[in-house]
């Protein structure tokens, strides 16, 4: 596309040059044409060079190459951090107490692999994301195979800086032969009883169709589903059948970044199946698929899904006595923030300074805060009212807004952690704009962002703008 645009630009320059030397136009118009041509060529050349360098810098190598090239560096760095046997025997290197042990830092190799995986999450197609983070391939009795995600794989696929297990990656899976009894017995390994994942058809495993649907549910506000259901509820009884639900699902999916990027790929087997094959559709409409689904039941499903995903995120931090540390909670809040690394490090240091010996947070405290975030748009409005009225946005105000808008109680300790992160100047008041913008990204888990680098869209916009500007300069309105 860029070559065609460049050739057409050069052709227009040639025409302009002949027009200029032909002397058939007034001098003023010829001067404007030459100025526009010169500025346009300079802008295209400069922008192309910068974008090309950026594309080269961000082009992801394969994960296998990263792991093989950086293996020696990672090993040498890890070996340097450990005490050798002689020092331990001499008592030079003492083992810390369990409560004093610090979390092992990510080595150079791990950081590079995580950066590559973050680019996959941000820019790749849903097909590639699924194939990279899925860990199971189940082979049926007839020899046919299908790839599945576990609930843990699903959470890892949408969470930045969560590294894929070693020896598993793109099209690399753990192979399991289909055995109905054996897989059913392993259901507890994949999902807890009572979890929404536990009710899925393949013993808590997630197929590609279910993966697309679950990401759509997580990235779509409740209000959008309410409107879509009302549009297709033709008789006004508040219920939709399977066919109407598939239309709702298709419309909602087409509005999400995942849905817009997806293309069925028969070569990999990752195609969106009809409702007849979906375990989730069976869950909604029963085994005979003749049931009805109400918006109330669907929103309850969305609430349970958000609860279960949050629970899995919480458990990934290995809670001690049912509590995670304040820094881990801060990491959950900032996971999808997009904040620059230097500022992110400064915010985490600020949190560490305030809570050197914190008591931690329970899952109930974490869940209450995320329930508060589900109403972030109303929270934004309420905080703006306080700001316009001249009231300070302190901890008491936040707790009052949570009670009024979300009907939940935020503990004093949760408010202390949030203010330690977002109280930039240390005056005990919240930085409202930054807090709301980061929390909106956290609520959507980054799933609403476009799955491309914007290079094509940028070049199209520049070309259109250059054409319009050239005509305005060359042929000014009389």
Curated annotation (Swiss-Prot):
Residues 61-85 are annotated as: Disordered. GO terms for molecular function: calcium ion binding; calcium ion sensor activity. Residues 457-467 are annotated as: C-helix region. Phosphorylation at Ser-124 by AKT1 impairs its maturation and stability. It comes from the Eukaryota. Ca(2+) 2 binds at residues 423, 425, 427, 429, 434. SMART domains: EFh. Residues 220-255, 410-445 form the EF-hand domain. Gene3D superfamilies: EF-hand (1.10.238.10). Keywords: Calcium, Calcium transport, Disulfide bond, Ion transport, Membrane, Metal-binding, Methylation, Mitochondrion, Mitochondrion inner membrane, Phosphoprotein, Repeat, Transit peptide, Transport. Residues 128-131, 261-265 are annotated as: K/R-ring. The modification Phosphoserine is found at residue 124. Heterodimer; disulfide-linked; heterodimerizes with MICU2 or MICU3. Homodimer; disulfide-linked. Component of the uniplex complex, composed of MCU, EMRE/SMDT1, MICU1 and MICU2 (or MICU3) in a 4:4:1:1 stoichiometry. The composition of calcium sensors within the uniplex complex can differ depending on tissues: a MICU1 homodimer can be present instead of the MICU1-MICU2 heterodimer in skeletal-muscle and kidney. MICU1 is recruited to the uniplex complex by EMRE/SMDT1, and it associates with MCU at low calcium levels, occluding the pore of the MCU channel. Associates with the MICOS complex. The EF-hand domains have high affinity for calcium and act as sensors of calcium levels. The polybasic region mediates interaction with EMRE/SMDT1 and association with the uniplex complex. This is Calcium uptake protein 1, mitochondrial. The lineage of its organism: Eukaryota, Metazoa, Chordata, Craniata, Vertebrata. The gene is MICU1.
């Amino acid at each position: 596309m860029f070559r065609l645009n460049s050739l057409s630009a050069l052709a227009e320059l040639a025409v302009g040059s002949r027009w200029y030397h032909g002397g058939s136009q007034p001098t003023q118009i010829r001067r404007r044409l030459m100025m526009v041509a010169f500025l346009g060529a300079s802008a295209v050349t400069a922008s192309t060079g910068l974008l090309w360098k950026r594309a080269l810098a961000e082009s992801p190598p394969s994960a296998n190459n990263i792991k093989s090239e950086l293996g020696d560096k990672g090993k040498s760095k890890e070996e340097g951090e450990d005490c050798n046997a002689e020092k331990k025997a001499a008592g030079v290197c003492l083992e810390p107490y369990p409560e004093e042990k610090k979390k092992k830092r990510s080595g150079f190799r791990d950081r590079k692999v995580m950066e590559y995986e973050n680019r996959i999450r941000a820019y790749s197609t849903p097909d590639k994301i699924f194939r990279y983070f899925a860990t199971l391939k189940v082979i049926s009795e007839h020899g046919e195979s299908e790839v599945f995600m576990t609930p843990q794989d699903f959470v890892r696929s949408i969470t930045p800086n969560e590294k894929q297990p070693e020896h598993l990656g793109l099209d690399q899976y753990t192979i399991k032969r289909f055995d109905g009894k054996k897989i059913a017995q392993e259901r507890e390994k994949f999902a807890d009883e009572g979890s929404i994942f536990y009710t899925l058809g393949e013993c808590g495993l997630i197929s590609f169709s279910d993966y697309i649907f679950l990401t759509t549910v997580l990235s779509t506000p409740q209000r959008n589903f309410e409107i879509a259901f009302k549009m297709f509820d033709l008789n006004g009884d508040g219920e939709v059948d399977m066919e109407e639900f598939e239309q709702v699902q298709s419309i909602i999916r087409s509005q999400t970044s995942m849905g817009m990027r997806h293309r069925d790929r028969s070569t990999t087997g990752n195609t969106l199946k009809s409702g007849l094959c979906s375990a989730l559709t069976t869950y909604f409409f029963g085994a005979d698929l003749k049931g009805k689904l109400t918006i109330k039941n669907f929103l309850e499903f969305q609430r349970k899904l958000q609860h279960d995903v949050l629970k899995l995120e919480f458990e990934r931090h290995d809670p001690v006595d049912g509590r995670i540390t304040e820094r881990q909670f801060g990491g959950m809040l900032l996971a999808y923030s997009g904040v620059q690394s230097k500022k992110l490090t400064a915010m985490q240091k600020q949190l560490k300074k305030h809570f050197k010996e914190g008591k931690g947070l329970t899952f109930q405290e974490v869940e209450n805060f995320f329930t508060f975030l589900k109403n972030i748009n109303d929270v934004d409005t309420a905080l703006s009212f306080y700001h316009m009225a001249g009231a300070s946005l302190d901890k008491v105000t936040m707790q009052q807004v949570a009670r009024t808008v979300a009907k939940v109680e935020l503990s004093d300790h949760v408010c202390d952690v949030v203010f330690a992160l977002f109280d930039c100047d240390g005056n005990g008041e919240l930085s409202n704009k930054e807090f709301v913008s980061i929390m909106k990204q956290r609520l959507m888990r980054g799933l609403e962002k476009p799955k491309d680098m914007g290079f094509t869209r940028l070049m199209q916009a520049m070309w259109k703008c250059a054409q319009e500007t050239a005509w305005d300069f060359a042929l000014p309105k009389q």
